[in-house]
Regions:
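Sec-dependent bacterial lipoprotein signal peptides
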Residues: 1-20
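Intrinsically disordered, low-complexity segments enriched in polar/charged residues with Gly/Pro
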Residues: 3, 67-68, 121-123
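Generic marker of residues within folded, mature protein domains
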Residues: 5, 12, 43-47, 83, ...
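A structural "domain/chain start" motif
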Residues: 21-80, 98, 165-188, 192, ...
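Sequence-level motif detector for i,i+2 pairs with an aromatic at +2
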Residues: 50, 88-90, 163
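Short, well-structured beta-strand/strand-turn elements
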Residues: 78-88
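Surface-exposed short loop/turn segments
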Residues: 87-159
Length: 214
């Protein structure tokens, strides 16, 4: 009898291991996301920049899905017209997703503070993070728009009146089991933060204050 009871207790203990792992690696939700920032997207002085935006996303992690469409949707809510032709855009937004995955929460601040184009390697465990660099180019748009085959960099430089950069880090203070990628709310929170920053740089669109930086 004691041996049978011991065997049952052992089976019960083993069955709880996957359950505990699931608790530690829950997906979480958008309300848990902390936003860290370095740099800012600035206004273009007194220039009259059309409220037309073009969004380009480079995801070097393949872990953040639908970020482009989310960013376009949020910009639309802020009063921008979104175009798929960069030569028609007054606001060209380049989003580079640099890292996504496990991180030591206390180490993320230094990575974000490294700023745009700085070191971007995440290290440690205990949290989950997304790191992105954002380049905003504001430009005049000629009234006569001709089709162009120039690349995005040339279009951004043409008629540019201002550019600014920022780095964003999104942090959830627990481990998340990464399947195909990060949970969808990471892309939504990042898109919302970007749209608010771009709207503030526009100065006329609906610029609700961003969530508090940490």
């Amino acid at each position: 009898m004691p041996i049978a009871r011991l065997f049952l207790l052992l089976l019960l203990g083993l069955s709880l291991i996957p359950l505990n792992a699931c608790v530690r690696q829950r997906d979480g939700d958008a309300g848990e996301v902390e936003v860290l920032r370095s740099g800012a997207l600035n206004r273009a002085g007194d220039e009259d920049i059309p409220n037309v935006a073009y969004v380009n996303v480079r995801d070097m992690t393949n872990r953040v899905f639908h970020l482009g469409s989310q960013a376009e949707a949020w910009l639309g809510r802020k009063g921008f017209t979104v175009t798929d032709n960069p030569s028609q855009a007054g606001y060209i937004v380049q989003i580079s997703v640099l890292a996504a995955g496990p991180v030591d929460p206390d180490s993320l601040r230094a990575v974000v503070d490294a700023g745009y184009d700085g070191p971007s390697k995440l290290s440690g465990t205990g949290g989950t993070a997304l790191l992105a660099d954002v380049l905003l180019v504001q430009r005049r748009v000629p009234s006569a728009r001709r089709p162009s085959r120039a690349n995005l960099k040339n279009i951004s430089n043409r008629n540019a009146v201002a550019s600014s950069q920022m780095r964003l880090g999104l942090l959830v203070r627990h481990d998340i089991r990464l399947k195909a990628g990060l949970p969808p709310y990471f892309a939504d929170v990042l898109a919302r933060e970007l749209s608010t920053a771009i709207s503030a740089a526009d100065g006329e669109a609906d610029a609700s204050p961003p969530s508090s930086a940490r």
